[in-house]
Regions:
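Short glycine/threonine-rich loop-to-helix capping motif typified by GTGT followed
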Residues: 166-174, 205-223, 253-268
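Charged, amphipathic alpha-helical linkers/stalks
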Residues: 286-288
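Conserved small/polar residues in nucleotide/adenosyl-binding loops
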Residues: 292-296
């Protein structure tokens, strides 16, 4: 696809918080600059002990209260490559407040509610009816506030979450195309964008059927990657916008195969305990009532 930038994966530690798993995934991605994603202040503190390399990104999602935002800003002051993703205006105000107090020019991202919906069991976590993220009009208000604070160049990332365990590749194509158009528009408005975060959703073919069912997916990993890269490049080339780094948060696909649960079958229930004969027993059945009329 001749894409003119790189790809990074970030591992959401909420997928599996076991220390051995997180450390192994983080170590395996060292040569590729892979990072970690956190959804709370405690997770951020855990990740801080791992990310000694300033080039490994930390993406901060989830609801962010005052203490969470303050921890993020202090991590920035230590030189960590940390990007809080803004999901409401309160988070933006807290970030601007603490950044001013500590003399930090913060890097930040915005999570966008797309009109494109996911599919399957977690479809409500994406789309414009999702409880997370900002509508397009709200994103424009964030841009306006950052511009007033002379921090528009600090808007580095655009993020969306389509859904989890996406079994239909068409949903991915639609969402990525829409997100790329939003990225291009924000770039044209003067934002200092560098990253496009497509969130999670990469499925796992649990039953091996390669079908459009909740426990499977109708695409391969190669097809997923090709479609994502092609759609982003195609949109941005048409808008004459530089290619960003692509980030994904495919925690399920990264960790699902690391272990298998094996257990003994203790019992089973059957449905054919009681049998009904096909022919009823010979009993005296009610006879039809016939009415006769006579010509008198």
């Amino acid at each position: 696809n001749e894409y003119q930038n790189r790809y990074r994966a970030v591992f959401p530690i909420k997928v599996n918080q076991q220390r051995l798993v997180v450390e192994e995934v983080f170590r395996a991605g060292a040569n590729f600059g892979f990072g970690l994603e956190v959804g709370s202040k405690p997770e951020l503190l855990v990740v801080m002990s791992l990310t000694q390399n300033d080039d490994r990104p930390i993406i901060c999602n989830g609801f962010k209260d005052d203490s969470y935002i303050q921890a993020v800003v202090l991590a920035m002051k230590l030189g960590r490559k940390i990007i809080p993703v803004i999901e409401n205006f309160m988070e933006l105000q807290l970030l601007l407040k603490h950044a001013k107090e500590h003399g930090v020019r913060p890097q930040l991202g915005v999570r966008v509610k797309l009109s494109s919906e996911g599919a399957g069991r977690w479809r409500d976590s994406g789309g414009d009816k999702s409880k997370f993220g900002l509508f397009i009009t709200e994103v424009l208000e964030v841009v306006h506030q950052l511009k007033q604070a002379d921090l528009l160049d600090c808007l580095k990332l655009v993020h969306c979450h389509i859904g989890s365990q996406l079994q239909d590749i068409r949903r991915v194509k639609e969402a990525v195309t829409e997100l790329a158009h939003i990225y291009a528009e924000l770039y044209k408005l003067g934002a200092g964008l560098e990253y496009l975060d497509i969130g999670g959703g990469l499925g796992v073919d649990y039953d091996g059927s390669r079908t459009n069912y909740d426990s499977s997916m109708n695409y391969t990993l190669v097809e997923y990657a090709s479609d994502v890269v092609y759609r982003i490049a195609n949109v941005l080339n048409s808008r004459k916008v530089p290619h960003p780094e692509i980030i994904s948060e495919s925690g399920r696909a990264m960790a699902a195969h690391h272990s298998v649960l094996v257990f003994n079958v203790l019992g089973a229930s059957v449905l054919d305990q009681f049998k009904v004969d096909a022919t009823p027993p010979e009993v005296e059945l009610p006879q039809p009532c016939l009415l006769y009329t006579s010509d008198a």
